Amino acid sequence: KPYISTSDEHIEDGTSTENSQEILKMTEKRSRKMETLKDNLPEPTYYGNSQAKKIFVGWGSSKNVILDIINNTDTNIGYLHYEYIYPLKTEKLEELINNDKELVLIESNQTGELGKLIKEETGYEFKEKLLKFDGRPFFVEDILDFLK
C-alpha cells in the first residue's frame, strides 16, 4: 500500500493547512522544541590530558580507538567526543578554540560532516583532518601514523 504525504504544514490535530498563521504557529512550536532539546543535551565529553596541545574532535566510532591510545600509550593527546551532534553544543569546543589548542577533526567519512556543522555553528574551520572512508574503522596505527 503506498504512503501518501502532503507538502503542506500540519496543525495540532494532524490535518494539513495552508493557513499562514497556523504555519507560523507550528514553525515556532518546533523552534521551541529544538531550544528545549539543546538546553537539555550534554556538552561533548573531554578525554585525556587537559594540558594536551593536540586534541581530536569527533563522534561515533572514533571514540574507542582514541581512548585506547590515551589509556595505553604515552601519546599526549586529548579527545572531545560528541555523543549528540544536533543541535550542536559548542561551549567546550569554543573553550578549546580560544585556548590555542591544535584541533584535529577525526571522522569516518569523506567530507568531514561534523567539521562542516562546527564551521556553520561557530565559524571555526579545522586546519587538520583525519578522514577515513574506506569502510574500515580507524585503527590505533592510523592515528599514530597521523601523529608522526
Predicted regions and their residues:
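Flexible, low-complexity linker and terminal segments
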Residues: K1-K148
